């Protein structure tokens, strides 16, 4: 149920009947304050200006044509021409009933699209670090939301599995295997990469061998391809452990590494030359873009092939966008890549559009995000100033959550405690990130994220168990409850019901903008409204069975909405805390 869409259409029709143009925007929004109703139509100002009349005069004319019979109990004009809409309690009650009768809580499915989501993208032969966290979990929340809405989502894990460093890594892997009688367990990927680099820098003979190996790998030699595959396998096996711990839906099947696009690169360079987009400049192949200017104010040159014949990230990104449209049949492509890559992506996409590889009708969207900072406001590092490994961060989250839940549940069994600590610890790390607007940097703070008050995972998980506990105490007959009507008489009942029915609107925003913090804010608000409702509208001690059952149904829809909302974020719920 999308009340905003329903009201927008009704107000738009009334505006047209009052003389507004057919493309007028009613600007129906959820009201910020209760006294302004549940929704507000703010579009009169802009349209009245075009029509040369006072906004309030237009609003009055719109009201004469606005039929919200059975939807609103009151409609009024406020200020210079805002239209405040108060939803009818009977309308709310009917739609709460419908939401409870549906597995999807009444959420409609929009027209199905094929959407490619590019996220996570770790590098081969390196351990995942905190810099990969935001892309991985924000991207996964977007994927879960889009899939719930019925879209065909293709996860694209753009792994860094190609480049000149692979000569050095294969040479080092070969040396290790010889010394360890062919047995090789790469437990410490970070150390492996560091040692390979040290040898490369200090041992000229080793460096020469590494350079030869790059050439052999790139020419398709089977032995070197096999060694390369081994490095990819070891890395992705380790990464999968991290994905599973994070409750992220990526699997090995979603890997679409840089190497996938290698065969396309020569053809793309040749095609861009043939189309007159790419030219030779100082031995390199360059595309000059008028949209981007260099320091001298001239069109910026974007290199797509170096003097030595090597390709660049831009070339791969051009091939990648082309592949996603032509081979994967994407109708929309979302990239969860940090904001520092913005210009690079815009340049690649400008070339993609000029070359006609992806039509303008297919959006390429950079859903960028800021950095994760320490309490000092600087990039999050270890005490020694090194990069924080993601596995270490999750270990610490688990350890802190164990202490926290053991303190609150001294009698809980070890198994239960471990499950609860896992849900709370991992949930806390994810929710702390997801609840912030992705476009900004955020401060990583253990105390805040593990707090049981405020907009945190522990608070949301606790809020969910609190609603469930009402049902345990009620000892209700599910069938009897399903048949009971919902009656809304109190203001707090109406406020809770209206917010519950805004779940679909929230999902729509997350799907459109790729902003999971909007879902977090909605769920936090919902938990707060339930708290006020629970305090002021007795459930188990209600004045009669009819009111008791109706309030139980509001509590039931609250629990289902909290659970489903947290699920779209990839946050686990628990039955007891």
From Swiss-Prot:
Its EC number is 6.1.1.19. GO terms for biological process: arginyl-tRNA aminoacylation. It is found in: Cytoplasm. Its main location: cytoplasm. It comes from the Bacteria. A motif ('HIGH' region) lies at residues 122-132. GO terms for cellular component: cytoplasm. It catalyses: tRNA(Arg) + L-arginine + ATP = L-arginyl-tRNA(Arg) + AMP + diphosphate. Gene3D superfamilies: Arginyl tRNA synthetase N-terminal domain, HUPs, Isoleucyl-tRNA Synthetase, Domain 1. PANTHER family: ARGININE--TRNA LIGASE, CYTOPLASMIC, ARGINYL-TRNA SYNTHETASE. HAMAP family: Arg_tRNA_synth. This is Arginine--tRNA ligase. It comes from Shigella dysenteriae serotype 1 (strain Sd197). The gene is argS.
